[in-house]
């Protein structure tokens, strides 16, 4: 029987043994647990022995690999030394005086040929040496990482020596960073070593796959010990809008070792995430500053938000018909704890060198994401179902109101949480990527069909309200009087155009809340563009009604058309002004949905702008009806001047002493002046100018073709009569210009020819087109000038 070993001397115990025994045997009753302690220690010793054996095998393998590399490198060095010796002997042979020059040249030629190949072999040896050293160094580092990971997973180490466990994990993270630095250097300097990098990446990925879940599990355990999340049961609907003065924040209440453990765990998670981002940047070949393409939420912040989300959803289920309470609760939680993100956690993120991350921003983003996920899963399906199931008009109207109320809540919520982020001064809210992360409206990115539904509802509601304003005739007659809007005085639009712009501006303002550029443009094309088309249809219908009833012969119909043109031109000018705004210019860059959402054509060409098509249609409408007004007046003027034109004998009659203007022309000119004055009083100045200039051009053609080109004979008195009549005609247009005859070019130049002497005309026309230009006759062709000259009768 084996003798019982005596107990060791107490004086031989180390300080750590004393500390261990004191911790295990505080009282005499603890001696009963000694058997269990022995079993536990034996188990741990067995595990350590197994681990030691594994490390020995790994060491043997490493030494064997090193020996293999050493043998190979030694062999290469031996070959190089041998060739260097041969080279030395070939170049140091003593030449005798009798040696010929040919032998010397041959020896130097041989040595010169050997040098390049020798240099190449030396470079290969150096490359192999560098590869071997790098491979061994990486193998050692990865081995340290794997050891540290296995140690961190050891249950006994985790329970009995928490400080040692933290040190092991910290050492593993530092080693991972060192390994990543070497891999980055190798990837840049030695791209041919890709297989080495791939092999190391594979082993590191396995280590990280074990480290991250364990780090997250430890972090969750610490949060649980901190009693996170805080209690939400005390919340009531009355307290949702007010900020809690005595809010219980477990993060601020941490003390001592618990705070140290939490900060260490938070720092470890941030370091692991930063390391993963570096590895991903290297593997994708992305340079520093371009990692926004794969921005990841901060893991540690996500773990803070997840239990809060679970606790909040217990309240959400009670408020399914009161979504305003849901938004209020999420905002309250976000606001109450956002300060601790800056004060407590941001320094830890900075210490972990996790560039480009703001804890405040990540906290708000995570809370908004949790809300968006709940909206997608629980709220929106209910609202969509209500719209699909509502067959009756009243029920569908209620469903639309509920939908728009939900959108209003989302827009209001986004503005409030974005103000929380902007207070830090870090985030640029003008960037679509940032807006997507802190906007509840980002739900439409994955569900563009819901965006289309929203645009349809928005359009219907606006058109219903606008129709009531369209049917009010007073809105079409009263003018916009706003001294602050200079364009309103220029275009003299009716009130209906201002009302329309209010509805259109409201749609545009709501579109600004949509976080993605391509979705913003999609919404405007589905909601704003049809609104403009509807208004244009109303303008066109009013003009067509006036034209169809009286062919625009009544003054009221001319006023009606003039007001419609004013309204259209005013809207056209506003759209042109908007097209220069940055908000609309961005939509004209041709950017589209990266997922190429079907069902919507490319919304715009870069040169057109978002409302390019609508602008062109408004311009076409305006020009068409301006021309229509001039045609109507010309038609009436032509009907009243028929007798004057048919009287061909009047141009050969002798001059009367009291002769002023032809009586047959007076009535036509009175009609012309009366109708034009009516239009001047009601049409905006720019379009009226275009109208009377078009009218003058048509009257010029009418008189020229009907009188001067109609083979009429003119005596001296006839020429004088025509001159006087035309002066009266010019006088009608002198109200709007200084030199009206310039707008009757053919008539004026025809009179110039008629007033010339017979010899001057005959001699001049024989010189042809050159003579016409010298006499400033530019609008008449040579044939027309000759025909006018032939109509002159000289006495």
Swiss-Prot record:
UniProt xrefs under InterPro entries: EXOC6PINT-1/Sec15/Tip20_C_dom2, RINT1_Tip20
Entry keywords, A to Z: Coiled coil, Endoplasmic reticulum, ER-Golgi transport, Membrane, Protein transport, Transport
Biased composition (Basic and acidic residues): 100-111
Listed Gene3D superfamilies: Dsl1p vesicle tethering complex, Tip20p subunit, domain D
Keyword Transport: yes
Induction comment from the UniProt entry of this chain: By salt and osmotic stresses.
Domain RINT1/TIP20: from-to ranges: 207-795
Family under the similarity heading: Belongs to the RINT1 family.
Name of this chain's protein: RINT1-like protein MAG2
Species of provenance: Arabidopsis thaliana (Mouse-ear cress)
């Amino acid at each position: 029987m084996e003798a019982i070993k005596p107990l060791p001397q107490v004086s031989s115990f180390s300080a750590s043994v004393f500390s261990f025994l004191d911790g295990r045997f505080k009282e005499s009753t603890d001696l009963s647990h000694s058997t269990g302690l022995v079993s536990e220690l034996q188990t741990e010793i067995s595990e350590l022995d197994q681990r030691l054996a594994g490390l020995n095998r790994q060491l043997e393998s490493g030494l064997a690999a090193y020996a293999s590399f050493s043998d190979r490198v030694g062999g290469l060095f031996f070959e190089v030394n041998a060739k260097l010796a041969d080279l030395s002997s070939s170049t140091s042979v003593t030449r005798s005086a009798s040696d010929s020059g040919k032998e010397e040249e041959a020896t130097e030629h041989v040595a010169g040929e050997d040098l390049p190949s020798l240099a190449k072999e030396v470079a290969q040896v150096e490359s192999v040496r560098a590869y071997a050293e790098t491979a061994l160094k990486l193998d050692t580092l990865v081995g340290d990482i794997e050891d540290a990971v296995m140690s961190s997973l050891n249950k006994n180490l985790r329970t009995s020596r928490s400080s040692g466990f933290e040190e092991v994990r910290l050492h593993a993270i530092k080693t991972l960073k060192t390994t990543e630095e070497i891999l980055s250097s190798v990837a840049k300097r030695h791209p041919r070593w890709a297989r080495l990098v791939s092999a190391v990446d594979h082993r590191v990925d396995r280590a990280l796959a074990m480290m991250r879940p364990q780090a997250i599990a430890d972090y969750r355990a610490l949060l649980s010990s901190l009693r996170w999340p805080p209690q939400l049961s005390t919340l009531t609907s009355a307290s949702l809008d007010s900020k809690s003065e005595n809010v219980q924040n477990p993060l601020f209440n941490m003390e001592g070792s618990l705070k140290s453990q939490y900060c260490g765990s938070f720092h470890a998670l941030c370091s692991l995430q930063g390391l993963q981002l570096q590895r991903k940047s290297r593997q994708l070949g992305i340079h520093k500053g371009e990692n926004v393409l794969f921005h990841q939420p901060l893991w540690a912040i996500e773990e803070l938000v997840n239990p809060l989300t679970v606790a909040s959803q217990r309240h959400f289920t009670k408020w399914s018909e009161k979504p305003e309470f849901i938004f209020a609760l999420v905002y309250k939680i976000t606001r109450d704890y956002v300060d601790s993100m800056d004060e407590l956690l941001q320094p830890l993120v900075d210490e972990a060198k996790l560039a480009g991350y703001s804890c405040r921003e990540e906290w708000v983003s995570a809370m908004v994401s949790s809300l968006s996920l709940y909206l997608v899963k629980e709220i929106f399906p209910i609202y969509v179902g209500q719209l699909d199931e509502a067959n009756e008009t009243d029920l569908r109207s209620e469903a639309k109101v509920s939908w728009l109320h939900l959108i209003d809540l989302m827009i209001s919520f986004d503005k409030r949480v974005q103000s929380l982020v902007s207070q830090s001064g870090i985030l640029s809210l003008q960037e679509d990527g940032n807006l997507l992360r802190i906007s509840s409206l980002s739900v439409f990115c994955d569900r563009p069909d819901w965006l289309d539904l929203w645009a349809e509802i928005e359009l219907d509601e606006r058109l219903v309200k606008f129709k009531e304003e369209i049917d009010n005739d007073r809105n079409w007659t009263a003018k916009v009087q706003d001294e602050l809007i200079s364009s309103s005085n220029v275009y003299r639009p009716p009130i209906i155009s201002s009302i329309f712009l209010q509805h259109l501006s409201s749609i545009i303002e709501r579109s600004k809340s949509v976080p993605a550029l391509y979705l913003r443009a999609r919404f405007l094309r589905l909601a704003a563009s049809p609104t403009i088309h509807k208004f244009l249809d109303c303008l066109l219908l009013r003009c067509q009604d006036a034209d169809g009833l009286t062919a625009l012969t009544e003054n009221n119909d001319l006023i009606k058309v003039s007001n419609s043109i004013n309204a259209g031109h005013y809207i056209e000018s506003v759209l042109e002004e908007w097209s220069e705004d940055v908000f609309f210019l961005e939509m004209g860059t041709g950017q589209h949905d990266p997922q190429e959402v079907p069902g919507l054509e490319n919304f715009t060409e870069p040169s057109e702008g978002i409302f390019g098509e609508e602008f062109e249609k408004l311009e076409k409408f305006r020009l068409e009806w301006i021309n229509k007004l001039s045609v109507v007046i010309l038609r009436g003027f032509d009907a009243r001047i028929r007798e004057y034109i048919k009287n061909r004998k009047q141009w050969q009659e002798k001059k009367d002493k009291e002769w002023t203007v032809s009586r047959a022309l007076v009535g036509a000119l009175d009609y012309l002046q009366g109708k034009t004055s009516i239009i001047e009083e009601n049409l905006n100045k720019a379009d009226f100018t275009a109208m009377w200039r078009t009218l003058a051009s048509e009257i010029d053609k009418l008189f020229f073709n009907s009188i001067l080109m109609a083979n009429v004979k003119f005596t001296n008195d006839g020429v004088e009569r025509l001159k006087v009549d035309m002066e009266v005609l010019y006088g009608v247009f002198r109200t709007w210009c200084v030199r009206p005859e310039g707008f009757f070019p053919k008539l004026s130049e025809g009179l110039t020819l008629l007033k010339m002497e017979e010899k001057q005309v005959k001699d001049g026309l024989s010189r042809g087109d050159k003579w016409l230009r010298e006499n400033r006759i530019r609008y008449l062709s040579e044939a027309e000038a000759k025909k006018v000259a032939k109509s002159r009768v000289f006495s």
